[in-house]
């Protein structure tokens, strides 16, 4: 039974200790731990049971098209078994058709199982986020390196800098003046959060507001503390996320393409069933006859052999109608799409996501690390000038921790005045951070804010010309890196050597500042302070001017500084004040812990008095900046009809400022109906929520928890939107899993986010999504092209068999030949159509609707027209060979075969009753076709006519592939060389067809013979008109579209 959560954040520390029946100085007893472990279990995430292999295999066959193929294979197998004595075939030759179909299905199943078995790793990645060990108080003794999975609620745990939090815990006491925890991957907050022991006044508050709680998977970056474990295992926030990921995976729906293909498969099944039944039924007279006596049928005669024969024709029709190669061609096209996207830094983990991107209607984006760099940087800073009536502002370029990324605008480090030099000194020395290089990415060690200040110092430079040259040279050569990772910050090092740091006044929540005492080159001590602007300004009595002189901080100057700071804050900048103090009283001569005044530094309550009467130096504005390319990507999405919604865990003002900066909103736009916190949005009724999400324009949801993100994505999907969700944190994982396509960041993204996603951005570049959407749209268009090509070919095959059955002539195509055409000769051109170039205006069209049919009425009409010509030409050449001496000026009887009347060909089944019917042997390549019985002329003797039919079918389909280069544009506008791969594929298909014609044992398997040059000429003459027919249809289609546009 799941325990009701205890709101430890809203209770005092004493009340929490009483609730968990534990003493802070002793911890739990071994006996109590055993009781609680039995009640709460181990502190680990549940391992979801994976699907067994047999279930994965079965799921691969749960597809309409696959089921049709299975049915065709089964019937073909039965018929081959029943008829093998009659046909004289045995072994492999008799079962070629069902074995080939089964081979295709098994191959597809193997690929599907391999993909799926490698897909579900998100929950394992979550486990890696949990701390492996902890320092725990048990039975009055502090146990270091205690296994984290053994923790139970009520345990007393000590945390220090660098520790990974092993469970959700209530902060009981601070062992340092301040405690900060990095929890951006869990909550989306861009800055480390300062924690305290104070209780909150409400039970119902956001995750980010629980400042007296530390959560499993987060990391302590500053300070140390003692905590009480309140939640373990699946009851932690990470555990809740795991459950949400699992629930989201259960809600995964089919991709738009799969829905369309399943719909197409269902219609195809019905059509095949009807046509097969009709073909079989219209030939009933050949296997069922009766006498009519007194107006009533009697004396029924039934021929099982003939019934089976025409049933086999119906099966051949099914084989012809099923595009067996379509699943593999779609898979190949999607795989090619993944390669193209990988070249653009979009790594696709699930093939279907390639096409899903193309119909995306909404992108739900995280802010931190997705729209922004997740790297704090100084955007601008200001100080007073020569007078207290004016400020001077300096803009700073660059958005990363790379010291060489940008510089200070209009800056000359050789002319830095005393005020700017002191600002550089404070930023360099009142600082515990560093920068390291991980591959090509620069990252911060310590607090991101402090790392950004150090990068600013590197951009400011140093006043010493010799040192400046030495630093510049070091940055050029490999010594820029101290080792493989750590970045050498030469300017900061210069300041730290110049002014030795002798004491530190740690940051705390009361005074909101940090101070350091340094020994200046002249031997005197100076206090350097940085902190919250309002707090430092309040404690300052003087202000420094540009020349280094100080003047009293009067009210007018104070208002000037406040006004300038307000202007910076409105841009979404976090403002840090900088100050100093020379008159340190008894600390003026401080040098080490042995100094008499050292006891004052041990008492944090004295820090406020030490940091009073300060001299205000200036203000630094920092931000987590938007990526440079995001603004353009947002505009591209807007033109493409894609809505953008920003869903972030950060605070409302920061989120709105970033959205304005990337021009999701204009600067003067009222955000009353466009910006909400997660809690505010969830408080609305369902109808109000739908109205908000339905409105045009961007939306921003701040302070969003994982459940909020998941609920927004779910609602959008229920509204019929195709949702792409981007993110990089653990908090994004459930929504990434639930979205139609989850997109994770490859560099800054957590493993949890990556494993829950469908696609990973290798460069963390938001604009890569736009490129991927364009590629997805292009792939869909190309898919329509090869589906149109393959289906029109299949329609032609169906019509040819239908005509054969209606006319009563011998079958001109057998199932194994149809399989060869559908799988092999059609495959290369269909695959090559996946390389068709994208339309120029592909990102200026709105996304296609979910309701848009894959095959509309006009496309169906074109299928039927082209298919009819394919069928007529295929059957026509078969009839011509039997009945005509020449055709289109080409002599057909040069091989010596016997001509028959069309009526004889249509009634070939009655051949045994004909009198004086004789046939002559004829040549087929080097082979002489002879007959022991004249009636064999319509079975054994049809090999040449059947070869011509098959060759016409192949040739027409090759020419038809040229028609598929563009849905509406003529070959004059879209010439074949625009896609050279198609020309290569056509050559390959012709080569493969030639192989089965001219390799004897393959010719025997497929029941065909070699053709002469004149016969090939006849094939080409009958096949080429398909291009002219489709050109006429394209012309009509263009006229129809223009008429519709004019009417609109």
Curated annotation (Swiss-Prot):
Protein residues bound to Mg(2+): 728, 732
Xref: Pfam families: Cation_ATPase, Cation_ATPase_C, Cation_ATPase_N, E1-E2_ATPase, Hydrolase
Catalytic machinery residues: 366
Matches recorded under SMART domains: Cation_ATPase_N
Subcellular location: Endoplasmic reticulum membrane
Residues noted as binding Ca(2+) 2 in the record, renumbered to the chain: 319-320, 322, 324, 822, 826
GO molecular function annotation: ATP binding; ATP hydrolysis activity; metal ion binding; P-type calcium transporter activity
Binding locations of Ca(2+) 1: 794, 797, 825-826, 957
Domain of life: Eukaryota
The protein's Enzyme Commission number: 7.2.2.10
Tissues/organs with expression: 9-fold higher level in roots compared with leaves.
Expression induction: 3-fold in leaves and 2-fold in roots 1 day after exposure to high sodium chloride.
Keywords linked to the UniProt accession: ATP-binding, Calcium, Calcium transport, Endoplasmic reticulum, Ion transport, Magnesium, Membrane, Metal-binding, Nucleotide-binding, Phosphoprotein, Translocase, Transmembrane, Transmembrane helix, Transport
Example GO biological process: calcium ion transmembrane transport
Lumenal side: 85-93, 235-267, 334-800, 884-944, 1003-1007
Gene3D superfamilies: Calcium-transporting ATPase, cytoplasmic domain N, Calcium-transporting ATPase, cytoplasmic transduction domain A, Calcium-transporting ATPase, transmembrane domain, HAD superfamily/HAD-like
Bilayer disposition of the protein: Multi-pass membrane protein
Catalytic activity: Ca(2+)(in) + ATP + H2O = Ca(2+)(out) + ADP + phosphate + H(+)
Predominant subcellular localization, coarse grouping: endoplasmic reticulum
Family under the similarity heading: Belongs to the cation transport ATPase (P-type) (TC 3.A.3) family. Type IIA subfamily.
NCBIfam families, per the entry: ATPase_P-type (TIGR01494)
Protein name: Calcium-transporting ATPase, endoplasmic reticulum-type
Species this chain originates from: Solanum lycopersicum (Tomato)
């Amino acid at each position: 039974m799941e325990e009701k959560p205890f709101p430890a954040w809203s209770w005092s520390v004493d009340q929490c200790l009483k609730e968990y029946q534990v003493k802070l100085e002793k911890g739990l007893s071994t006996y109590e731990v055993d009781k609680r472990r039995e009640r709460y279990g181990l502190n680990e995430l549940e391992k979801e049971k994976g699907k067994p292999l047999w279930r994965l295999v079965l799921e691969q066959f749960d597809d309409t098209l696959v089921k049709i193929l299975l049915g065709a294979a089964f019937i073909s197998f039965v018929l081959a078994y029943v008829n093998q004595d009659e046909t004289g075939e045995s072994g492999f030759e008799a079962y070629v058709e069902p074995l080939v179909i089964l081979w295709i299905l098994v191959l597809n199943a193997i690929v599907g199982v391999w993909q799926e078995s490698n897909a579900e790793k998100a929950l394992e990645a979550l486990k890696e986020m949990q701390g492996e060990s902890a320092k725990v108080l048990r039975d009055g003794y502090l146990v270091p390196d205690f296994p984290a999975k053994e923790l139970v609620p009520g345990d007393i745990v000590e945390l220090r800098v660098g520790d990974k939090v092993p469970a959700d815990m209530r902060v009981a006491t601070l062992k340092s003046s301040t405690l900060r925890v990095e929890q951006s991957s869990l909550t989306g907050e861009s800055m480390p959060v300062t924690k305290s022991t104070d209780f909150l006044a409400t039970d119902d508050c956001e995750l980010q507001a629980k400042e007296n709680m530390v959560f499993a998977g987060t990391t302590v970056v500053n300070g140390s503390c003692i905590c009480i474990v309140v939640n373990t295992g699946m009851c932690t926030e990470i555990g809740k996320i795991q459950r949400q990921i699992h629930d989201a995976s259960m809600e995964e729906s089919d991709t738009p393409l799969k829905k369309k293909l399943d719909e197409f498969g269902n219609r195809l099944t019905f059509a095949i069933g009807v046509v097969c039944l009709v073909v079989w039924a219209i030939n009933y007279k050949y296997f069922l006859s009766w006498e009519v006596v007194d107006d009533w049928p009697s004396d029924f005669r039934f021929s099982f052999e003939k019934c089976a024969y025409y049933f086999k024709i119906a099966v051949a029709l099914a084989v012809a109608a099923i595009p067996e190669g379509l699943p593999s061609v779609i898979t190949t096209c999607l795989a090619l799409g993944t390669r193209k996207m990988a070249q653009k830094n979009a790594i696709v983990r699930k093939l279907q996501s390639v096409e899903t991107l193309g119909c995306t209607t909404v992108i739900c984006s995280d802010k931190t690390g997705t729209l922004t760099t997740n790297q704090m940087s100084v955007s601008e800073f200001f100080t007073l000038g020569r007078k207290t009536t004016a400020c001077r502002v300096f803009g700073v370029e660059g958005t990363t921790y790379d010291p060489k990324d940008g510089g200070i605008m209009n800056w000359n480090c050789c002319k830095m005045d005393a005020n700017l030099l002191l600002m550089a000194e404070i930023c360099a020395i009142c600082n515990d951070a560093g920068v390291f290089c991980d591959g090509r990415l620069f990252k911060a060690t310590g607090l991101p804010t402090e790392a950004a200040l150090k990068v600013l110092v590197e951009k400011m430079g140093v006043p010493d010309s010799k040192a400046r040259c030495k630093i510049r040279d070091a940055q050029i050569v490999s010594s820029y890196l101290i080792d493989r990772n750590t970045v050498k910050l030469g300017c900061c090092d210069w300041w730290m050597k110049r002014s030795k740091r002798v004491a530190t006044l740690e940051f705390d929540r009361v005074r909101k500042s940090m101070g350091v005492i340094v020994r200046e080159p002249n031997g005197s001590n100076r206090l350097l302070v940085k902190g919250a602007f309002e707090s430092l300004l309040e404690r300052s009595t003087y202000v420094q001017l540009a020349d280094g002189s100080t003047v009293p901080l009067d009210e007018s100057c104070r208002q000037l500084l406040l006004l300038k700071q307000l202007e910076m804050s409105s841009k979404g900048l976090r403002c840090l004040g900088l100050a100093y103090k020379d008159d340190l009283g008894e600390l003026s001569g401080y040098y080490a812990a042995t100094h008499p005044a050292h006891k004052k530094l041990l008492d944090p309550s004295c820090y406020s008095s030490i940091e009073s009467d300060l001299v205000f130096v200036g203000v630094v504005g920092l931000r987590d900046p938007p990526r440079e390319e995001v603004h353009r990507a947002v505009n591209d999405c807007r033109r493409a009809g894609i809505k953008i919604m920003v869903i972030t865990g950060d605070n409302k003002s920061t989120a709105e400022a970033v959205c304005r900066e990337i021009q999701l909103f204009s600067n003067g736009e009222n955000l009353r109906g466009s910006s909400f916190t997660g809690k505010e949005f969830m408080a609305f009724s369902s109808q109000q929520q739908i109205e908000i999400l339905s409105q045009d324009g961007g939306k921003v949801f701040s302070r969003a928890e994982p459940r909020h993100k998941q609920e927004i994505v779910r609602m959008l999907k229920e509204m019929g939107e195709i949702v792409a969700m981007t993110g990089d944190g653990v908090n994004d994982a459930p929504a990434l899993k639930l979205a139609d396509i989850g997109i994770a960041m490859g560099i800054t993204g957590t493993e949890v986010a990556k494993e829950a996603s469908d696609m990973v951005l290798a460069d963390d570049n938001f604009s890569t999504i736009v490129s991927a959407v364009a590629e997805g749209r292009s792939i869909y268009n190309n898919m329509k092209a090869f589906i149109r090509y393959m289906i029109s070919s299949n329609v032609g095959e169906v019509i040819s068999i239908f005509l054969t059955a209606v006319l009563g002539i011998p079958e001109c195509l057998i199932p194994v030949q149809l399989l060869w055409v559908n799988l092999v000769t059609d495959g290369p051109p269909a695959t090559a159509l996946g390389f068709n170039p994208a339309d120029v205006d592909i990102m200026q069209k709105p996304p296609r609707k979910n309701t848009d049919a894959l095959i509309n009425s006009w496309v169906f009409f074109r299928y039927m027209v082209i298919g009819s010509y394919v069928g007529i030409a295929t059957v026509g050449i078969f009839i011509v060979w039997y009945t005509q001496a020449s055709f289109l000026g080409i002599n057909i009887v040069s091989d010596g075969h016997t001509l028959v009347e069309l009526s004889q060909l249509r009634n070939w089944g009655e051949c045994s009753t004909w009198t004086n019917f004789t046939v002559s042997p004829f040549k087929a390549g080097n082979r002489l076709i002879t007959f022991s019985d004249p009636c064999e002329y319509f079975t054994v003797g049809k090999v040449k006519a059947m070869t011509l039919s098959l060759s016409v079918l192949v040739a027409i389909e090759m020419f038809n592939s040229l028609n598929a280069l563009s849905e509406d544009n003529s070959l004059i506008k879209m010439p074949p060389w625009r896609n050279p791969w198609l020309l290569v594929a056509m050559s390959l298909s012709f080569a493969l067809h030639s192989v089965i014609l001219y390799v004897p044992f393959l010719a025997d398997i497929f029941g065909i013979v070699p053709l002469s040059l004149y016969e090939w000429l006849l094939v080409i003459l009958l096949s080429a008109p398909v291009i002219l027919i489709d050109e006429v249809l394209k012309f009509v289609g263009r006229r129809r579209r223009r008429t519709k546009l004019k009417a609109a």
